[in-house]
Structures are given as structure tokens and as C-alpha cells.
Amino acid sequence: MAKFVLGIDLGTTNCALAYAEIVPEGGESKASAPQILQIPQVVGAGECADRPVLPSFLYIPRDGEFQEEALDLPWTAPVEGKLPWLVGTFARDYGAKVPGRLISSAKSWLSHGVVDRSSGILPTTAPEDLQKISPVQASATYLAHLRDAWNQYSAANGLDAVFEDQEIFLTVPASFDTVARDLTIQAARQIGAKHMTILEEPQAAFYAWLVQSGDQWRKSVSVGDLVLVCDIGGGTSDFTLIQVSEEDGSLKLDRVAVGDHILLGGDNMDLALAHAVSATLKDGMEGLDANQKIALVHGCRAAKEQLFANPGEKKAGITLLGKGSRVIGGSIKTGLDRATLEQVILNGFFPESAPDEMPARGRRLGLTEIGLPYAVDPAITRHLAQFLSRHSSLSKESTMASPTKILFNGGVFEASALRQRIISTLNRWTGQEIPALPAADLNLAVALGAAQYGLAKRGLGVRIRGGVNRSYYIGLETPAPAVPGVLPPIKALCVVPLSMEEGCQTDVPTPDLGLYIGEPAEFRFLASTHRRDDQPGTILERWAADELVELPSLKTTLEAQSPDEVGQAVPIRIVASVTELGTIELSCKSRIDERQWSLEYNVRKSESGQ
């Protein structure tokens, strides 16, 4: 029996772990309040220290690049002649100078359907002598560090509670589809996690607010409220809507909408500021070497935080060390002034846009290097307008969903000016004053909330009902005469509706369907974050380009009983289920005998095309 629930924020920029002890008392259980684990990590060569977060950066050192003991951790078992991979603060800071050996944004790669996320593709700019690793392996490495940190803490405090035996609540962006979730689960299983549950990050932030508010939360929201969780971290922007209703005389919380996966966050802002500041230098960005460019980005981040924290200051200084032997004497002094900050961040990323202004799509070249699908339009307010417009059915007689409360999460919102810009924009769109709920620690809320969710699942707190964050469809081939060069159209059959609860299954009402067996077949899957009314059995013959997103297809051969059946279509019915981990399983049951075939969405095979 697990003694602790562990909440893990596997973030794009930082990871964190929160824990809460479960204390049996009589025939019931009580729990301690969630706390943050201080994580030992290398912060400099030969220097180890505890930090509340583990930066999500992995550096793969060259042989002999450091003395063997320079990267030691409290739990390290040194291998003679081989340096361990470096994770955390020093990996981020040192690796920024050697970007070809540094892995960052592994989490964003998990959601990138164009590449094989289980193969070695990172670092993307690695030198030829470096063996690349997969986004799954990189994520597993961060989780392994958290596992080892917890096990060391458990042993040092006599808790007898190894990581592998505890209940793990692992967070993912609400916008992660079933494939990205499966890959995250796969990474956790690689490091020995046995008892896992997946939770969406904005929901975790809301749970953290519930913990912080205690019994007062019921006075902060009321029946009919629609709470917008606006979560902007270092790498992503994530939007979620939570509805407050009543059931049996008690307030009930339901996650009713999630947004698409948007690669846009604080890192984009720091880079934009660096380009703006470099324009004031004699030779611009081209006059800086690689280390100076990185230092400029870091300097702009610090200057941004200083100016936002001190509204009376007009300018924050930035110093770049010189090149080569002129490190000190050749230093460059520059700075970020408030006018540039507001022009780049407030007007560039948070413009006062109209409610009908949607994100620009931008032109794409026919050929492109394979990389992360960053948002073309940097205006977060326009992405928010698109999200609310897609869920207009949640508010009567309106062209967009109208939140009545807002909860901020993510380090970007440490700047009150950015919170105020979002609030003023929403007020203008909706014609009403929208109060902000007081947030917990913006950088640690997700981990704390994940641990609280673990307690709520045990009956030790209120739960948010959510279910799956998309409706899912399987492609149906349409019988049509063969025409050279023209593929037959497909229809989309809804098999799992939006918000279907974990642990549930449903018979999918269908017309007569046939399942080809005994020979290779391809199954096409699609998903939507905003088709709220589709139910199991709904068939779509056409849809707008942004309504359904096609997922990686599944290619497999389903077993036939005899050679005569090979290539034949067996009449079937479909049963769909959502596992406790939030993944999708489809069972095709024969209408003529007792046979059934499972379409298990095997991530590794679906991505390699086998």
C-alpha cells in the first residue's frame, strides 16, 4: 500500500515534485498538506545543491570534458571512464554554450506527430560523434532524476517509501492528445513507475488553488461560473474552461473545454527581447559570438523580470563579457528600457486585439527543416480569442465563451502587467469585470495540485470531473468507383465523445461495418477539441480544416481463422473504452461469432509505420 501520493510536473522548462503523506487513522485515512521536494542537482562543476525545481535540460558531455567527480550526485554510482548525463541547472547553464550537446523542450517533441518520437532525434543539431536520444528517453531521464531524489529523501528520513511503490500523478498539457499521453506514460514506466495517473496541468493548477483556498473556495465561485485557466509557461500556452454547477445541493466542478497545443511562451518572449536589444548594438546580433548571444537572452530575461517587478524603473542594465582574451576589457554594456519591453511583450505577445481577431496562419514554404511546430502568430490574446470562439456554445447568445473568473498559472504571469493585460482584454470582449482568483505559487502550483488530486481521488478533497479532452473518430472508407489518381473519400465515425470519463466504455451505434482481416490494413484516427455535441455513432461526411486533426494512423494485420477469410470483411460492432490512464481502446466484436479484435493504439508501431 502506498504511503505517499507524488505529484509530478514534467514541464517544458522546469520539473517539480510535490508529496503528501497518507496517514491511516482508524478505518479512515487522513493526509498531510502537499509539500514541494527540494531536488539535489549539479549547479556547477563539482557543486551540488538543492533546488525546488529541476530545469528540463539534458547535457550529454564529451569524454573527458569534466573530471569524473565533477558531476556526482548524492546517489551517483560512478562508472570509470564514463561521464553521466547532466540534468538540471548546470545542464541548462553550461549546455547553452555548447547547444549541439544540449537537449531542451523534450516535452514539446512528445506532441510533434511528424517525427518518430521513440527514435533518437535529439539534440537536433548534434555533432556526428554524438548518439542522439529520443524525446521519450529524455523525458524518462528527467523522471529518473526525480525518482532518485525522492528515494534519497525517503531513505534519509526513514520513510520506507520508495518511488516505485507510491501513487504517481503525472501532469501533461490539457492539449496533449492520446499519443502524447501514451508516450509520457511510456517514459514513466521506463523508470519503474507502477501506479500512475495522468492529470491535465490546468486542472492541477486549479487543484492547487483549491488547496490554497481551503473551505473558502465555495465563497469564491458559485453556480454558473465559468472559470478560465490561463496557463503560460516557458514553452507553451494552454487554455482550459472549468464550469461550476450544482449536484445534490453541493457545488460541482467540470472541465468542459481545452485548447489546442500552442508552442508559445516565455522563451519566445526572451528571444524577441534579445533581438530588439541587439539592434541597439554597433554590429547587431551578427557581431556577437554564440556565448554572447546566449548571455544576451539570459540578460534580457533578468531585465524583463526586474522591470516588471519595479514599475518605477525606466531601464535595466545588461552586461555581456567580451570575446576570447578580452573577456573583461572587451565587455559590452547595454540595457532593456521600458518602452522596448512594452512594445515587444505587451504589444507583440499581448496586444489589445478584437474578439474576432484570430491568429494569423502565415505562409509556409514547400520545404522546411524538421523542427518543432512553433506558433506562427505570437499574439497570445488572438489565440485566446480563437479558443473562446470555438466554445461559444458554453455562453448563451454570444459569439464566444464568456468566462466569469480567471485563474493564472505559469512563470510568465509573475509579471502583474501581463495578468492585467489579459484581464482588461477579457473585460472588453465580454463587457463585464472578470476577477482573478488568487493563484498559488505560479511555478510550483502544478506539482502541488497534482498531489492534491491524488488525495481527492482517495476522497480527501473535492474533484474536478473532466474525462477525455477530445472527441475521437475512426475513418470509414466510402465505397466508390475507382478513379485513377483519386483516393476514395473517408467519413469520420465518432467512437469516443468529448469528456467521456476514465474507466468507462460504450457500444458505438453504427451502420453495417466490415473489418478486413488476415492482410495488412490501415486504420485512420482523427480528433477534435471543440466538437462538443458529437456522440458515439455520429458520422461526419465533411468538416472544416480546423475541426478535426488527423492522428498517426495504425497499420496492422488482424488475425484470420482460415485462409478463406484472408482479405474478407467480417461484420462487426465497435465497443470503445477509456482507460484509467485516459488512453483509448477500441474492440471490434464479430456479429456472426464470438471473436473480437482489439485496436490497441500501440504508439511505437503507429509512429514507425509498421
Residues covered by each model-derived region:
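Conserved phosphate-binding catalytic cores of ATP/NTP-utilizing and phosphoryl-transfer enzymes
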Residues: M1-A2, I198-C230, S389-S392, K396-E397, ...
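Early-domain small/polar-rich strand-loop-helix modules and first-structured segments
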Residues: M1-S119, T197, D248-L253, M269-L281, ...
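Glycine-rich phosphate-binding loop of actin/hexokinase-like ATP-binding domains
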Residues: A18-A20, E28-A31, Q41-G44, R51, ...
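Phosphate-binding loop and its immediate beta->loop->alpha context
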Residues: S32-R189, E200, L271-A316, G324-G362, ...
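Phosphate/ATP-binding catalytic cores across multiple sugar-kinase/actin-like superfamilies
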Residues: T141-D160, A208-S220, G348-S402, R421, ...
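Glycine-rich phosphate-binding loops at beta-strand->alpha-helix junctions
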Residues: I168-L183, L321-R326, K333, L372-D377, ...
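Conserved phosphate-binding/catalytic loops in two-lobed NTP-binding clefts
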Residues: I191-A204, P373, I422-G449
